[in-house]
Amino acid sequence: MKLHKKIAAVMLCAALLFATACGTAPAQEQSATPDSSTPTIRFLLRGTASGMDRVLDALYAQMDDDHRWQLDFTFVDSGDYAQQLARSLTAHDNYDFVFDAPWQSLAMQTEQKNYKNLKNYFNNPEYPALQAAFSEEYLAANTISGGLYAIPFTNTYYDVPGIFYRKDLLQTLGLPFDEITNRAEMEQYWAAVRKKGEMKPISLGSRGFYQYNLPEITLRQNGIWVSQGWSFWDYPSQILLSSDGKQVLDVVFPGDSNEHFAALPERYQTNFLDVYLQQNAADSQWLSPDDLLQENGARVFLLGQSASYEASLASGTGQVQQQLRTIVPEGEVAFWAYDDAFLPQNRAQGSIPTTYAAWNDLCVPSYSTNTIEAMRFLDWLYSDWSRIDLFNYGVEGTDWQVVGDEEYTLLQPMGESFRFPSYELAWNPQHHRIDTALPDAEKALLEFTFDQSSYAASPLAGFTLNTTPIAIEIAGLNSLYAEYYTAFGHGAYGAQTQEKIDELHTRSEAIGLETVRAEIIRQIQTHLDKNSAE
């Protein structure tokens, strides 16, 4: 079989070993055992990877004559991935699996019939490992119009967002605390870093402050939800449900009038979406102008050039710290979850409302002629959790070591360290490990999110917005908001923020905002009525 390397034009389309190239750049081959009869499974994924040669060697060593494939990965830098995916699907590029997500283009691509319905491959005894790893309930929560057009990947039903920060740096700043536990302490830390003048207080990526000023789980606990099927980041909106979950009270947008909110029940009368964008503007004092151009705030942090960055917890601070120490040997990384719903005293059974929908997926292009072979590979991959561990942690004994039944420790391999966007292939609610070196508080937070009893089903579970009746309006709104997205997310409008919110709302009304509002309300109420009747 052949292994190939692909290098992206922008950053690093892959730090990998596989064939072809981003766009039309020539491929660079690397040695491997050639076998032209071996089926090839081709992936188009988002992000970067390293240390994959040894991972694939270990994976190939487990294959036999009846289960043998050559894997070919194309990695595209996160900032360019959405456009590359659209181009590849339009051009019918030869991929068997492509990454997509509800927050990216999953609903749109599905409605355009660009993905295959994979329902027959799951809950199917001919694919026993997939049947075991993907429960019927989990799949049901991830269907679109009754079909399974995306294979859902999540290691937990909520990945906690927060701020990764330099704990070693904090301890040199003379502040009266040695860890960050609230917003006031975080701002004191940023202020002290700025005063010292050696690095940026925080580096943000393309998603800006993300949920820092709009804590999602706290909102859910108060009956406020985003719509599955139309990403909040394509155009911000929130669904307001009654306290019993049986009625949709409204769908609200930035720029809705104060009178609009005043007509709602008391707990919804704050124009919280405007407040969210205004708070982003207030917090922009901590940013540098070039943050608007950064795709990933972690890169600046890992180079030792910023004191913090915003991201979701994923597997914890361990791998982040390992990468930082290649540049900053004394670096120590900690994490603060900025949603108060995750304070230790607020954690309880059923305290995380969820739809059980995954936020990352693999899809099979509708034109693929290799689907059976691709699904055979996926079934084989999931037939042994040790294979999944390869894509989560690297090679055991080189990159990591088992500790007990559910923990692991990271090792320092010779050469490049392992890195792979495992959320695109190897996350599953049934299989977890926790880095044994993590602080006890961080372990406890991960254990809480891994525990399925921490979750409670939302009345919106199983609902996905059918955008077909409002496709023209939503396309127009998405295109319009793209003009504002980066500046709103980073607070770059400053004192002009409210003016820009009002401008967005006026322009949105002209291209169908009220039509969209009415249709979302209608569809959700139909869903809630169906729930009540069952």
Predicted regions span which residues?
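Extracytoplasmic/secretory soluble proteins
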Residues: 2-3, 12, 16-534
